[in-house]
């Protein structure tokens, strides 16, 4: 009864505009007071332990790296380079958006940050080539979600920290699924562009322009190679490489491209601090409510119910996907991971599901959550950039939403895609 009441209170607080972390903190405090044998001091102790984590230190640095790339206008450079050869195809500029999304995903690990950076760099160009506003907003919004799957993913960092999985293995697991998702989106862009005659088509690929622009783009192109290569070569941990990424982005922006000023770097640092504070606040609030749920035996009870239900592994995963998709309508990605991971991973273990595979499934659901009304953050980001209503952005996302659901099904029922490097 306490749990049901807590859920109702959380939903009410969110509906009236209370910040997620505050809502979770209020409900947790109430549940602690109503639960026998749990001292109130446990709130401070558990909250501190939840954010006093070495792996979580990677989050502010990766966020800063993404913001510095955005301030340094690196998206413009990558778009111009790729566009010289890709725009020979129908829908070439939209394809360029997706290629650039993959690049940003391999550096920042943030969905919203990628969508904001790429949207600011491409929307005017998409409009000039007569792409409808809602299609332009939709393709950038859905491309931004790749930042959650392709390493270094903030989602994988959170999951690894919460359930104790190696973050470098989670990063490896996200490579094939991320590239698969990008490929499916590219095919859908080509199909829709041909069907509705979107965009202009260059007569020939501009290879001269490509090789002219390539030398200048090399420092930016090296960034994801250095970031991921350092992790997988064992040179740096994910936390260490996050700091390297931020410093590298700052140096090439200040001294090589000269597109970042001191004031711009300060703004990037300030924005990163605000974004990280919000993430940490949700981590703190979610860990508190997760602790009390475990203390009340909710996780153990769910495992017991699951053992008696006699479900097959695929039936369990189907139910999990439905639950996460529904919750994704009302919770942002960080909150969704923090609230559900402590409950779902023990259940997945009972079903004999590889935890790395299950982590990929969870991140794939979080990607879709960022596109799902009424909370989908990428919808609001693109609504602000393109200056169209959120429901119009949602209409633009709809064809790609179907593609993402198909991709989710593939990742769910073909574990080898997630375990390719295991």
What are the residue ranges of the model-derived segments?
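Alpha-helical transmembrane segments of multi-pass membrane transport proteins
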Residues: 1-422
């Amino acid at each position: 009864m306490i749990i049901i009441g807590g859920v109702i209170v959380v939903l009410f607080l969110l509906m009236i505009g209370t910040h997620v972390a505050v809502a979770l903190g209020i409900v947790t405090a109430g549940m602690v007071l109503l639960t026998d044998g749990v001292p109130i001091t446990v709130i401070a102790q558990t909250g501190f332990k939840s954010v006093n984590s070495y792996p979580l230190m990677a989050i502010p640095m990766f966020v800063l790296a993404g913001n510095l790339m955005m301030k340094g206008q690196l998206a413009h450079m990558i778009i111009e380079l790729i566009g010289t050869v890709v725009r020979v195809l129908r829908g070439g500029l939209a394809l360029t958006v997706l290629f650039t999304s993959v690049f940003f995903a391999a550096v920042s690990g943030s969905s919203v940050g990628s969508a904001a950076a790429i949207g600011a760099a491409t929307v005017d160009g998409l409009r000039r080539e007569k792409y409808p506003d809602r299609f332009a907003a939709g393709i950038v919004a859905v491309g931004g979600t790749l930042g959650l799957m392709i390493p270094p993913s903030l989602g994988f960092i959170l999951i690894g920290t919460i359930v104790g999985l190696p973050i470098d293995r989670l990063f490896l697991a996200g490579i094939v699924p991320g590239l698969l998702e990008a490929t499916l989106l590219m095919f859908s862009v080509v199909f829709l562009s041909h069907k509705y005659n979107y965009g202009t088509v260059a007569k020939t690929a501009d290879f001269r322009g490509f090789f002219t622009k390539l030398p200048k783009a090399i420092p930016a192109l090296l960034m994801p190679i250095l970031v991921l290569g350092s992790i997988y070569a064992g040179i740096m941990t994910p936390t260490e490489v996050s700091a390297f990424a931020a410093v590298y982005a700052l140096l090439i922006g200040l001294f090589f491209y000269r597109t970042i000023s001191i004031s711009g770097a300060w703004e990037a640092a300030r924005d990163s601090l605000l974004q990280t504070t919000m993430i940490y606040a949700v981590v703190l609030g979610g860990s508190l409510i997760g602790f009390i749920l475990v203390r009340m035996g909710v996780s153990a009870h769910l495992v017991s119910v699951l053992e008696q239900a006699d479900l097959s592994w695929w039936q369990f995963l189907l139910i999990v996907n439905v639950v996460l998709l529904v919750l994704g309508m009302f919770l942002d990605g960080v909150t969704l991971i923090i609230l559900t991971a402590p409950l779902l991973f023990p259940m997945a273990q009972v079903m004999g599901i590889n935890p790395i595979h299950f982590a990929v499934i969870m991140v794939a659901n979080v990607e879709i959550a960022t596109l799902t009304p009424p909370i989908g953050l990428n919808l609001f980001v693109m609504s602000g950039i393109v200056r169209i209503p959120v429901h119009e952005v949602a209409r633009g996302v709809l064809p790609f939403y179907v593609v993402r659901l198909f991709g989710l099904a593939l990742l769910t029922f073909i574990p080898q895609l997630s375990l390719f490097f295991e």
